[in-house]
Structure formats: C-alpha cells, structure tokens
Amino acid sequence: EMKRVEPSFGVSDFLQGARGAYEMIVMGYERCDLAEIQPFLADDVYESFVDGVAAREDQGLTIEANFIGVREMELNDAKMDETTKEAELTIRFVGELTSEVRNREGEIVEGSSTEIKRQKDTWVFARVMGSDDPNWLLVSTDG
C-alpha cells in the first residue's frame, strides 16, 4: 500500500534509516541533548523526554553512556490510513550500550562503563506517505 502512494518507498532503506535514528535518539536522550533530536520526535514524545531529563537533573544525576550497537531489529507492524495516507511502522530494537549514572557527588549509583546492557525498545515511526518531508517522526516509545 505504501509503495502505491509513494513508489520510491523501500522497507530496507527505511530500516537502515531507523537504525541510525535509534542510536541518535537513544544517545541524545542519555546525554540530555534534546535539541539535536527534537526534529525527529512527535511533540508528546519530545515532552516525555523533556520530563525525563528534567527529573534526572532535579535529582542531580548525570549519565555517561556509549552506544555499542543494534543487535536485533525487527519490523513488527506496518499500517497506513487510506484517508490521511499516514503510515505507521512499528520496529522492535535490541540495542547494546554502556551506561553509568552518577549522583551530585560523582559517585556511580547505577550501571557501569564496562558492563554492556541490553535495551529492548518498541518504537513507532509515522509519516504521511507522498509528502515532501522525507523524515519519519518517532510517535511512540514503549520499552
């Protein structure tokens, strides 16, 4: 259906872009650098990220994280609204990263810079097919 509305659409190209977006968005959130990732987030997702970052800052927590890579990635669902032409693709990611949380005193309170943790996320990306804007927005995150 999506290809009918937008013949140039390809799932493998989308997945390649989604993989890059996943790393950029996860690391933007971990590093509290939301300005860089805001253009890729739906407003409500952005607001929830802002709240999460603010909560960390209120507690005096800082995170030092390194992205190792995407271990698994699966297209779980794809649907398109015939009327609005808005497509939604649901992707399940398994990412690996190291993450160290420190308190105001600089003590590690969670994680480790050497221990690789697996993070599972199910994200929904949306876009109006056939529109001039090629970017997909992250409209839902569900660990």
Regions found by a protein language model. Give the residues of each.
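Residues in flexible loops and secondary-structure boundaries
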Residues: G10, S48, E57, N76-T83, ...
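Core segments of small alpha/beta cavity-forming domains
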Residues: E1-E74
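Compact beta-sheet-dominated globular domain cores
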Residues: E88-G143
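Short secondary-structure boundary micro-motifs
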Residues: G10-S12, L61, K85, E107-S112
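Surface-exposed, charged secondary-structure patches
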Residues: L61-N103
